[in-house]
Amino acid sequence: MSIASFRCHALSVVTALTVQDSAGIENTTVVDSDWLEDQARTILEDMPVRCFKIGTLGSIENVAVAAEIIADYPDIPLVLDPVLTSGHSDEFGDEEMVSAIYELLLPQTTLIAVNSREAHRLSAPPDEDEPDSILPFDECARRLLETGCEYALLTGVHESTATTANELYTIRGRVRRDEWDRLPGSFYGSGDTLSASIAACIARGLEVEEAVRQAQEYTWQTLAAAFRPGMGRCIPNRFFWTQLAPGNK
């Protein structure tokens, strides 16, 4: 829905089947890596693609297959949202999968979008001398960008602050910082909305920094207009803009 809001067409490849509701994920079945590859290559042989967006992969095998496919299309930008930590602080993927993402996917990534907890998991391996230390944003970003990744967007959604500060880094350092009023409530899918929106903006030809700006604005609006259809968290209203059209009430 986020991608459609930017007038792009999403071509989905299923990586995992989940049992979930508005509160969270209860169980996951990972798709076999051969199936993942067949899905992706069938689509890529049929239609032109302007941007890749990778979310949950679920297994080391799927990480490896995704990396192989991406390597065959070096001119297509890649937005990586690895989904290593949920909104309820649940951790997904063991350290071997985290290492596989770091070693195989990050070097091919145009932009990685992660919250502070995910950034720390990816940039601070558990075998370091101080595994419980919390790295600052700039150090997390530096370690992520050392792999060859071009941009790192670190979001402050999990920080205990009055505003949410998102920071975009390149190997030169921080290139933009955006602060957003922290909205009341708990949201399900805010990170997915942001990364999908960035991918859509890049697909439409925007430079990365402008894509990040527009995607943040869109995501904040979806959260401001969020609704709560069940007993769990609020769902971003990705089509909020239709309610702002003249004549709509």
Region annotations inferred by a language model:
Residues H9, D75, R174-R176, C201-A215:
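Phosphate-handling active-site elements
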Residues G24-V30, D90-E95, P125-P131, L183:
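Short glycine-enriched, charge-decorated loop/helix-capping segments at active-site entrances
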Residues M1-G87, W241-G247:
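Conserved N-terminal subdomain of the carbohydrate kinase-like
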Residues I54-G55, D90, T155, F187:
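Glycine- and other small-residue-rich loops at beta-strand/loop junctions that grip anionic moieties
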Residues R121, G185-V208:
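Short, small-residue alpha-helix embedded
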Residues G93-V175:
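Conserved phosphate/ATP/ADP-binding segment of small-molecule kinases
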Residues V175-Y188:
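Short pre-catalytic strand/loop immediately N-terminal to key active-site residues, enriched for Gly-Thr
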Residues E209-K249:
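Charged C-terminal helix
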